Amino acid sequence: MSTLNIAVAGSSGRMGRALLEAVERAPDMRLSAALERSGSPYLGKDAGELIGSPCGIGITDNVDTALDGSQVLVDFTRPDGTLVHVDRCREKNIKMVIGTTGFSPRQKEALWIASRDIAIVLAPNMSVGVNVTLKLLETAARVLNEDYDIEIIEAHHRHKVDAPSGTALLMGEVVAKALGKELSEVAVYSREGHTGEREAGSIGFATVRGGDIVGDHTVMFAGTGERIEISHKASSRATFAEGALRAARFLADKRNGMFDMQDVLGLRQ
């Protein structure tokens, strides 16, 4: 069994630590680098100490040297930082698994351009369960059509900085596409005051932030006399970390291109 050398960006964060633990558990992977932002109090420390198991890999903010010897960089950071990492990976021909959310259209375009040269899995949610849920939503939207009003409710921990979540937006995109629409044309992101009646065919979003909620998503199809709710609730970041490593394995034999978890899981039709 060949070993895949994995670099982790944002290694001291909540997802970073979950990734370190997942790499340590994986028999076919080895931690090759642990990255942190400049000024982080964790710089210079053994990355393994973050999860109670020293590994001999020091945490660094030097992207160039850290990526030497790595095959895949797993990045759950923030858009600006991810774009810096993309440029370095492109220079060094290193594949990327990107779980960062909150990209602007221009930033997404930069990722697509980079994928001409390197292989990238870009997914706002790496959970296997969420990606199965997306297939269920696609089927439900196609069958129920516009006879049902669609609302998407998501909840996350108090530290999340973007809203709606990338997963909620992806769910909206899947549903809108199944209805033959663009999400940008039908999305309603806030309601306040005298809003008037609900506009037919719109897709509403509601956001909750609080506590340590890992991630809850519910898509409601509300019809006359009945309501269908399709939900996914994450109780541990380990599910996202395991999905990210599955994505890294998928990229092992890919030279370039943009992929998502539907590709990784073989759900693409």
Curated annotation (Swiss-Prot):
Q: Where in the cell is it found?
A: Cytoplasm
Q: So where does NADP(+) get bound?
A: R37
The UniProt record gives the binding positions of (S)-2,3,4,5-tetrahydrodipicolinate as H157, G166, T167
Q: Name one GO cellular component term.
A: cytosol
Q: What EC identifiers does the entry list?
A: 1.17.1.8
Question: For binding NAD(+), which residues are annotated in this chain's numbering?
Answer: G10, S11, S12, G13, R14, M15, E36, G99, T100, T101, A123, P124, N125, M126
Source organism, top-level taxon? Bacteria
The protein's matches in InterPro entries, at most eight in alphabetical order, are given as: DapB_C, DapB_N, DapB_N_CS, DHDPR_bac, NAD(P)-bd_dom_sf
Pathways involved: Amino-acid biosynthesis; L-lysine biosynthesis via DAP pathway; (S)-tetrahydrodipicolinate from L-aspartate: step 4/4
User: Could you tell me which CDD domains the record lists for this protein?
Assistant: DHDPR_N
Q: Which is an annotated GO molecular function term of this record?
A: NADP binding
- Residues the record marks as active site: H156 (proton donor/acceptor), K160 (proton donor)
Keywords of the record: Amino-acid biosynthesis, Cytoplasm, Diaminopimelate biosynthesis, Lysine biosynthesis, NAD, NADP, Oxidoreductase
Q: Which reaction does this enzyme catalyse, per its entry?
A: (S)-2,3,4,5-tetrahydrodipicolinate + NAD(+) + H2O = (2S,4S)-4-hydroxy-2,3,4,5-tetrahydrodipicolinate + NADH + H(+); (S)-2,3,4,5-tetrahydrodipicolinate + NADP(+) + H2O = (2S,4S)-4-hydroxy-2,3,4,5-tetrahydrodipicolinate + NADPH + H(+)
Is Isomerase given among the entry's keywords? Answer: no
> What are its GO biological-process terms?
diaminopimelate biosynthetic process; lysine biosynthetic process via diaminopimelate
List, alphabetically, the PROSITE patterns matched: DAPB (PS01298)
What is the documented function of this protein? Catalyzes the conversion of 4-hydroxy-tetrahydrodipicolinate (HTPA) to tetrahydrodipicolinate.
Q: Which family does it belong to?
A: Belongs to the DapB family.
Query: What NCBIfam families does the entry give?
Result: dapB
Name this polypeptide is given: 4-hydroxy-tetrahydrodipicolinate reductase
